[in-house]
């Protein structure tokens, strides 16, 4: 796969030079518990200037080979010193030597105790350039004839050359296992990264793998996570990753998540990750206009686990109404927002062929200030691994008042064969790194059995309805039309102090004849106009589906909830009249 060399114009070489000059940081870092990427060691270039090879690359392009090298120089003195005016050359394994061109943005001097990165590049028409073996600094005196060349120092590079995104990292010290912390000393000696979750999901753009790292500042001053890329690698090719967060600042001791989304292809299995850092080279055009060429260099490889990293066996068994434990680093649900699952039921749908699971979550603000109502996403996974995404109830509420709770429903369309016995519930953040979902909580659960010690006590969470008595009678009219009148005596109580939407739960009443046909129906809310109340009330059924009198009748009481796919009904009680 040919590499992509991005080109962009800048206003001045000075601005590019500022970008290329990093803040002071040692290349070698000793971090207990973290696998630190080794560097080539430091070399004495002059009595005051020491050198390191930061990166070397040799990448095939469409018309040849592009060789890049970046060296890092340190001023060990107490005064500003000039960058030695040496040529940088590269030698192949066949003994062919090339002189690299210096970037127009390379620094001319080094502040005391500071460092600078010098970039070099050369494009060859020769496609089959052999492996690079050595970098060397050469002092050239062009003011004598013949010109005088004095070798200063040579550094072996045969083990660190990057050959492009599809190449493999074979250095044992640069291959890390999943979950093993690592650092990138070429960027920072204080920031540590630990891969923690890997999730495969489908997106409108195609299959994607979402990687989550914990970035931790081990140092003593605030740092910004530098730019680096993570690519996914299969057996045949690599897939570029994109970081979701633009600017991540870490105070000393602080931890934050950073995420990468890697778009792949159908049936592709990633087996490793390549961690790459950016390099730049600036060249001047005919009119002294600077052009920046950006490229990346592989630093280390992370071996991927064979499947998603969420271990179902480690997730707790959930008890309804308990507070759900969220990832403490999540950005969607704060510590003062309490979320609990209060009901999980299986419902029949209007259309044949599938059922609907309804999950009711109570979201409570335990703090003293209004907070946003968190719009988390949910997903159910059954024992066979089939995943069902939840559809959130539409609500106009955006803020939670202090000490108040709000009820939010989620619906899941499932096959009619689904029993709902062994389910995994995942709560996800689908906003922080949209369009990807990242898990922020998870637990094992099951659909609640529709059983009650009292057959006349019906649950329409957040309401309990005690059916004291009921009766159905014929209702005639002067025009000869008839209907049915139902008398209901109810005792309605609220289970929790929670604000419920008008569509959170309704009572649906069906009148069914001896043949099992529904001849009349009515849905009555618990909120708003014509709501159900405690005490005696009468309901009229006039829009009948039969033109003749039917008797006896069967009365069926359902909990009815509107979902985007239609009405979902849960049968609560059947009564013969």
Can you say where each PLM-predicted feature lies in the sequence?
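Sec-dependent N-terminal signal peptides of Gram-positive bacterial secreted proteins and lipoproteins
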Residues: 1-30
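A eukaryote-biased signal for short, well-structured alpha-helical docking elements
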Residues: 24-45, 139-186, 283-334, 429-466
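Post-signal peptide N-terminal segment of secreted/secretory-pathway proteins
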Residues: 51-138, 143-146, 232
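Short, solvent-exposed loop/turn segments enriched in Ser/Thr/Gly
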Residues: 64-70, 207-212, 353-359, 484-487
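Asparagine-centered strand-capping/turn motif at beta-strand->loop junctions
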Residues: 73-80, 215-221, 363-368, 490-497
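Short acidic, flexible loop segments centered on an aromatic residue
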Residues: 80-97, 220-237, 370-387, 502-515
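Short, solvent-exposed, Trp/other aromatic-anchored flexible loops in extracytoplasmic proteins
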Residues: 100-131, 237-286, 387-429, 518-562
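Accessory, solvent-exposed terminal regions and/or long lumenal/extracellular loops of proteins
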Residues: 430-433, 437-445, 450-472, 483-501, ...
């Amino acid at each position: 796969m040919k590499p992509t060399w991005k080109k962009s114009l800048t206003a001045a070489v000075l601005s590019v030079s500022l970008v290329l000059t990093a803040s002071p940081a040692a290349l070698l870092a000793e971090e207990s518990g973290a696998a630190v990427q080794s560097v080539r060691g430091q070399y004495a270039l002059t009595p005051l200037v020491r050198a390191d090879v930061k990166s070397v690359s040799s990448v095939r392009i469409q018309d040849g080979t592009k060789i890049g090298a970046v060296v890092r120089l340190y001023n060990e003195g107490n005064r500003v010193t000039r960058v030695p005016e040496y040529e940088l050359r590269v030698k192949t394994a066949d003994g062919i030597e090339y002189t690299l061109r210096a970037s127009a943005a390379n620094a001319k001097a080094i502040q005391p105790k500071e460092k600078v990165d010098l970039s070099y590049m050369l494009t060859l028409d020769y496609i089959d350039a052999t492996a690079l073996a050595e970098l060397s600094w050469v002092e050239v005196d062009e003011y004598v004839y013949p010109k005088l060349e004095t070798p200063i120092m040579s550094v072996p590079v045969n083990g660190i050359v990057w050959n492009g995104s599809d190449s493999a990292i074979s250095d044992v010290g640069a291959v890390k296992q999943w979950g093993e912390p690592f650092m990138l000393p070429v960027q920072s000696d204080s920031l540590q990264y630990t891969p923690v979750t890997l999730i495969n999901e489908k997106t409108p753009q195609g299959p994607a793998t979402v990687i989550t790292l914990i970035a931790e500042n081990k140092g003593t001053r605030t740092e910004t996570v530098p730019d680096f890329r993570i690519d996914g690698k299969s057996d045949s090719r690599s897939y570029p990753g994109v970081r979701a967060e633009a600017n991540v600042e870490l105070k000393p001791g602080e931890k934050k998540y950073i995420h990468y989304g890697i778009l792949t292809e159908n049936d592709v299995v990633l087996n490793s990750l390549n961690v790459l850092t950016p390099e730049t080279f600036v060249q001047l055009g005919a009119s002294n206009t600077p052009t920046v060429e950006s490229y990346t260099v592989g630093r280390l490889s992370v071996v991927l686990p064979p499947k998603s990293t969420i271990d179902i066996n480690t997730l707790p068994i959930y008890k309804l109404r308990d507070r759900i434990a969220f990832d403490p680093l999540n950005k969607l649900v704060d510590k003062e927002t309490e979320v609990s699952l209060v009901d999980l039921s299986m419902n029949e749908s209007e259309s044949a062929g599938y059922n609907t699971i309804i999950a009711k979550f109570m979201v409570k603000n335990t703090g003293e200030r209004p907070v946003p109502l968190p719009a988390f996403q949910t997903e159910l996974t059954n024992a066979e691994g089939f995943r069902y995404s939840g559809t959130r109830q539409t609500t106009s509420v955006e803020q939670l008042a202090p000490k108040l709770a709000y009820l939010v429903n989620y619906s899941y369309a499932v096959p009619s064969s689904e029993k709902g016995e062994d389910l995994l519930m995942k709560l996800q953040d689908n906003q922080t790194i949209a369009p990807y979902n990242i898990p922020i909580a998870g637990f094992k659960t099951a659909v609640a059995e529709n059983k009650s010690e009292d057959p006349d006590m019906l649950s329409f969470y957040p309401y309990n309805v005690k059916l004291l008595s009921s009766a159905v009678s014929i209702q005639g009219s002067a025009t000869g039309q008839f209907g049915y009148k139902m008398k209901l005596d109810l005792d309605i109580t609220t289970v929790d102090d929670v604000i419920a939407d008008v569509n959170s739960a309704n009572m649906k009443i069906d009148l069914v004849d001896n043949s099992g046909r529904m001849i009349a129906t009515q849905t009555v809310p618990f909120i708003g106009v014509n709501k159900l109340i405690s005490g005696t009330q009468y309901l009229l059924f006039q829009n009948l589906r039969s033109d003749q009198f039917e008797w006896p009748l069967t009365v069926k009481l359902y909990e009815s909830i509107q979902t985007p796919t239609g009405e979902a009904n849960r049968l609560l009680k059947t009564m013969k009249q």
